[in-house]
A protein has these predicted regions:
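Structured alpha-helical
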Residues: 1-78
Length: 78
């Protein structure tokens, strides 16, 4: 479950254990059904009651995907 997203990265919950410093190819669906494809580096992990909270940094996100995230944030923050 994605809790927050910005052009710099994403915060999310998962039951799966991921290692800090690891990289993943990701595909994220925004509310507008726009898809974001990016490499995500796990930079933070915090164990929680129902799994793990992760902070991930986007690596090499395209300008067009960054704009999609900016638009998502405008509507999400209303």
């Amino acid at each position: 479950d994605i809790l927050n997203i910005s052009r710099g990265g994403v915060g999310f919950l998962s039951r799966k254990r991921l290692e800090v410093g690891s990289y993943y190819d990701t595909r994220i669906s925004l509310f507008s059904r726009e898809m974001i494809d990016a490499v995500l580096e796990i930079v933070h992990v915090e164990e929680q009651e129902k799994g793990y909270y992760y902070g991930g940094e986007f690596i090499g996100i395209s300008d067009s995907d960054a704009v999609k995230i900016d638009i998502y944030q405008v509507f999400h923050d209303i």
